[in-house]
A protein has these predicted regions:
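Short hydrophobic/aromatic-rich motifs at helix boundaries and adjacent loops
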Residues: 15, 102, 246, 291-292, ...
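A short hydrophobic/aromatic micro-motif that marks alpha-helical segments and, especially, helix-coil
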Residues: 17, 102, 306, 484-485
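Catalytic centers of hydrolytic enzymes
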Residues: 29-38, 47-56, 63-75, 110, ...
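Acidic, metal/ion-coordinating pockets
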Residues: 26-343, 400-403
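Gram-positive cell-envelope targeting signals
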Residues: 1-27
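Generic alpha-helical secondary-structure signal
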Residues: 9, 133, 476-479
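Generic detector of low-complexity/intrinsically disordered segments
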Residues: 13-20, 83, 518, 560-565
Length: 621
């Protein structure tokens, strides 16, 4: 890359040879002390413990491979910091251990992370789930420390530990958060605060490494907070919190200030929260920027602050190296995004730890569905990828998921309603992973729809059924047509309805043709079209999160679109928990399981060709 020159190690040797001062302690004119700092970083890991297949036929991610690269980098730069910018959870089946085992934080401790911050997805289990996770992490750590305190422990002690906690993990990363705390009116405030204090969550900290005192703090962004509506936390102004932390850390002797921010960057300054933060606050040397899943090939430099992002899902380990002198002048020496791919060997200790997590998932979560982690459900002869950003067209994965919801409602829902017509809906924003060509497993199905937690307290949003008038159903189509260009996550995929729109027409008036369709689930997919009656009530099956978002359309469109989810009798829904679908055993019908069961029924025949190039659904002209 542009700034890749040579490692900090060789730079230090060269400077020492030229100026006869200790390595890393001179500048070009040999009059001011110069230090070299290396920061290794990730963000938005989303529980990607295991590698994922790529469209190119390779693999990306996996914590055992990440650990290998971390060790390799620290062999060259032993004083390097290792930090994370939040959203370390929610994205694979291992997240089902979040509240009970804290697998994410414990594994990050085993990989050598110094400090992390929290993101919106750490609150998918609500504020109480976050607190339970912290308590689980601390309990496991304390038990591990006690277990290892004496050289020879009885075998039964080790067996008892593993039965309760799984892997032995005596180290945890520091958890930093300076502007996000339980709201005063949160009824669980005392419990959450106690858990945070028990773990040792703090707003900022100093860390000495290689004779240098570093100051670190964590922040939650505006959009990130909005993406955590059930957190029960209150966010304070990021710039004010940052100024307070910088002042505190400087007072404690910090020479380099690092902000772990779950705020993100955007295409413009107005949408780039971390650029605004750097502009508003002096004294921050580095911002590790998470939330927007950005991959910055070069650091952004704003107000003498390096803003760095390595991309999501453990795709890369970021490495930033810069020199600095006692006058505060910095010089970028090296910036790399190191791929975590199939060419990297797995670190055996982390690979073994991950296998233990997989076994626990099978015992505690998948068993109730009669599935195993790597069980093959069916196969596909083609890739099904998540939608491209701001591309308004049919998508095979979106169509597959919406069909799966409708199929599950008809097949698995214990109380399937005998309604005149049902439409199923999913949204771009909840599709979290691709389905690559080849064998499709239970874990892959979960990865696609891994968000959220149900009213039963277990991972995965449940399906819900609500009712919309025909006019409101058309309004939902208009959301797709008009809002998607500025908010790609709003793109919708429907089964049981189709529509066409023209992006050159007026905003919120782009849909010009809409109809209901029969869905047969045979090779033809759909047949017969019916007119939508504006005044009739139509049943809509979707995920809990998508239903909640549909309920915000009126306020988000400033009243231009009216859409209010209803009960079958036409009264407005006041609690979506009343709309959850259940299977014959009384279990919540989860989004991911609807997809898994739909895939499984294709068996050895594999996915039909219609999902390779879906012709039904929306059409842009």
């Amino acid at each position: 890359m542009k700034f890749r020159r040579f490692s900090a190690f060789f730079l230090a040797l060269l400077l020492a040879a030229l100026c006869t001062f200790p390595a890393g302690a001179v500048t070009d004119d040999c009059t001011q002390e110069t230090n070299v700092t290396t920061i290794l970083f990730t963000h938005d890991l989303h529980s990607h413990f295991l590698p994922q297949s790529t469209a190119e036929g390779g693999e990306s991610g996996g914590y055992a491979r990440l650990k290998t690269v971390i060790d390799r980098e620290r062999a060259v730069n032993p004083d390097a910091l290792l930090v994370d910018g939040g959203d370390f959870s929610i994205g694979s089946l291992i997240q089902t251990l979040y509240t009970t085992q804290a697998a994410e934080l414990r594994t990050m401790g085993a990989m050598g992370y110094d400090a992390v911050t929290i993101g919106n997805h750490e609150f998918d289990h609500k504020g109480t789930g976050f607190a339970e996770m912290l308590n689980s992490a601390k309990a496991a750590q304390q038990a591990a420390v006690e277990l290892l305190r004496v050289d020879a422990r009885p075998l039964e002690d080790m067996d008892a530990y593993k039965e309760r906690f799984g892997p032995v993990t005596p180290v945890l990363p520091m958890l930093l958060e300076a502007n996000y705390a339980p709201a005063d009116d949160n009824p669980d405030r005392a419990f959450i605060r106690s858990a945070m204090e028990n773990y040792g969550v703090t707003d900022c900290m100093t860390l000495e490494r290689g004779g240098v005192t570093y100051g670190l703090f964590g922040l939650m962004g505006v959009d990130s907070d909005e993406c955590a509506p059930t957190s029960g936390f209150t966010r304070t102004d990021a710039a004010k919190a940052a100024k307070r932390c910088v002042e505190t850390l400087k007072g404690e002797g910090a020479e380099i200030i690092v902000c772990l921010s779950h705020s993100g960057t955007g295409d413009s300054l107005a949408s780039s929260e971390d650029e605004e933060l750097a502009k508003a606050v002096d004294g921050i040397d580095v911002i590790v920027s998470g939330h927007t899943h950005s991959t910055l090939a070069e650091p952004l430099v704003v107000n003498d602050t390096y803003i760095v992002s390595s991309g999501p899902y453990c795709q890369n380990l970021g490495s930033l190296t810069f020199s600095w002198d006692d006058g505060g002048e910095k010089r970028l020496l090296d910036y790399r995004l190191i791929p975590i791919d199939e060419t990297v060997a797995e670190a055996p200790e982390i690979a073994g730890l991950v296998e233990q997590w997989k076994d626990m998932v099978g015992e505690t979560y998948l068993a109730r569905y009669g599935l195993t982690y790597d069980e093959v459900l069916t196969r596909s002869d083609y890739d099904l990828n998540t939608p491209a950003s701001a591309v308004q067209e049919n998508n095979g994965l979106g169509t597959l998921v919406s069909d799966a919801f409708l199929w599950a409602d008809r097949t698995l829902n214990a109380a399937h309603a005998d309604s005149p017509h049902t439409v199923s809906v999913t949204a771009d924003g909840v599709l979290r992973a691709n389905l690559p060509a080849g064998d499709l497993t239970a874990a892959m199905a979960f990865d696609v729809l891994s968000m959220g937690v149900g009213e039963d307290g277990t991972s995965g949003f449940p399906l819900v059924a609500v009712y919309l008038t025909g006019k409101e159903l058309k309004a939902a189509m208009e959301v797709d047509a008009s809002v998607t260009p500025i908010m790609p996550a709003a793109q919708l995929y429907m089964s049981g309805a189709k529509y066409a729109f023209n992006t050159k027409r007026m905003f919120f008036n782009r849909v010009y043709d809409a109809a209901l369709t029969d869905v047969t689930f045979d090779e033809s997919g759909t047949e017969n079209a019916y007119e939508i009656d504006d005044n009739a009530l139509y049943r809509v099956v979707t995920g809990m999160y998508s239903a909640q978002m549909l309920g915000t359309v009126k306020s988000k469109s400033m009243g231009l679109l009216s859409l209010e989810p209803k009960q079958a009798n036409g009264t407005p829904v006041t609690d979506f928990a009343d709309c959850i679908l259940y299977d014959a055993n009384g279990n919540e019908l989860k989004e991911w399981y609807a997809l898994a069961a739909y895939l499984e029924q294709f068996g050895e025949d594999g996915l039909p060709d219609r999902y390779a190039d879906p012709a039904n659904g929306c059409k842009q002209v």
